Amino acid sequence: MILITSLAVLVSYLIGSIPAAAWVARRRGVDIRKVGSGNSGATNVLRSLGKGPALLVAAFDILKGAIAVGLARALGLDPAWTALCGVAAVLGHNFSPFLGFRGGKGVATSFGTMLALDPVVGGGAFVVGVGCIWLTRFVSAGSILGALTAVTLAAALARPGWLLLIVAFLAALLTWQHRDNIRRLQAGNERRLGEKKD
């Protein structure tokens, strides 16, 4: 079982490392790492290539987390290891070997993992995050608020300790990945969704 568990974590990491944004952009003749923010994620694809490619990338990245969790469950892993497979997918997305161990910020893959692990916690976080983005037009603020909502829900609903720890880790990692965005939000120069770059 140790071998199966180790392989599941490794495969989950590799699933997460599939650089959907880079591949979709490359088909359009664009190196996503050299345009916009340089981030290999759906938001940069949206700003650089438009809604269609961005939706495709977002859906793929969400599925990476969900597939990793589903694979672990299909293999009969216990809930904690199943959750860790989701974490591995997020780490693969953020630090992809296909992109020199760089990648995106893990927002879509984190929410895909949370939705698969606990639809109530993940769904609530998703709704709050999207709502914040819709109201403020700040993708970074919505992403962070959504992740923190997941932690709050997991604690308030008395979910198992392993789930609370996993969700808290994902929220902390996501927030860290947005540290530059947080500085820009504090300085008042973070770009809103749909805002053109000067």
Swiss-Prot record:
Q: List the catalysed reactions.
A: an acyl phosphate + sn-glycerol 3-phosphate = a 1-acyl-sn-glycero-3-phosphate + phosphate
Origin: domain of life: Bacteria
Where would one find the signal peptide in this protein? none
Output this protein's name.
Glycerol-3-phosphate acyltransferase
Q: Which GO terms describe its cellular component?
A: plasma membrane
Biological-process GO terms, alphabetical: phospholipid biosynthetic process
Subunit info?
Answer: Probably interacts with PlsX.
State which Enzyme Commission number(s) the record gives.
2.3.1.275
Q: Which organism is it from?
A: Deinococcus geothermalis (strain DSM 11300 / CIP 105573 / AG-3a)
